[in-house]
Amino acid sequence: MNTTSDTLRVGFIGLGSQGGPMARRIIEAGYPVTLWARRPGTLEPFADTAAKSAGSPAELAAASDLICVCVRDDADTEEVVDAVLGGLAAGGVIAVHSTVHPDTCRRLAERAQARGVRLIDAPVSGGAPAAEAGRLLVMAGGDEETVEFCRPVFASYGDPIVYLGPVGAGQIAKLLNNAAFTAHLGVAVSLLALGRSLGVDQLRLADVISHGSGNSFALERVASAGGTLARIGEHAGHLLRKDVRLIADLAATAPAGAEGGASEPGDAGHGHGEHGATLLAAADAALALMNVGR
């Protein structure tokens, strides 16, 4: 087992639109990389690289010191982590880049610890273009020394890399980010529709707002999609719904009057406990516009 980050052997599972560019950046940074995918065709884009392929997650684990997992949801994450724990040597590290419930990461971290393996959560934000440019936001939770151990690998595709606290803290930050993005999508659609009804050209209004204090990443996405959420909902609605459901579940368990947190007026009447009602109401409105209500 290598113990210094500059000699790390990296395994990567989850080579989709987000994970694929991340894996390529690690390879281009010079790390020895092993890949695994359920479908052999997923590995074809890496034929021009020095990456090796494994026949199973356990085989990948046996050839790795750090394993990055970037799969779709909680069930896939649990399945992959359980599989790699069968081959990863004590002292190895698993970084969960998937966006999942914090409790999923906490549970998996306990299983890993029982085998002498360290697990951190490190969800990312920014999409494929940011990954390709090495500008993904990485939100890390877990043992801080372990996060620092992984930082040079994360830096091949991420900047900034933010340490947030214990295992699960990264997921909480990512889910809040995604809930805010969902809410902003709905606000952007409403803003552009109101502007049209008042006689202002939609594209010119979007250009103005993009240079003002009301700008948001969501506004850019909505404007480029013609001022509606139809296309965004078709491609990402189910994932946004998943994340809003997860943060709503967390909000329902947030202790009343948590230290440092101010209650929102009328929260209790929104069914979201004392915290997060305004955020979740706006996110729910956006999901409804995408026809994927929570």
Question: Where are the regions that the model predicts?
Answer:
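Rossmann-fold NAD(P) dinucleotide-binding segment
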Residues: 57-118
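Hydrophobic residues within alpha-helices
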Residues: 22-26, 108, 194
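NAD(P)+-binding Rossmann beta1-loop-alpha1 motif at the extreme N-terminus of oxidoreductases
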Residues: 1-69
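Rossmann-fold dinucleotide-binding core
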Residues: 10, 99-176
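Helical "substrate-binding/catalytic lid" subdomain
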Residues: 169-294
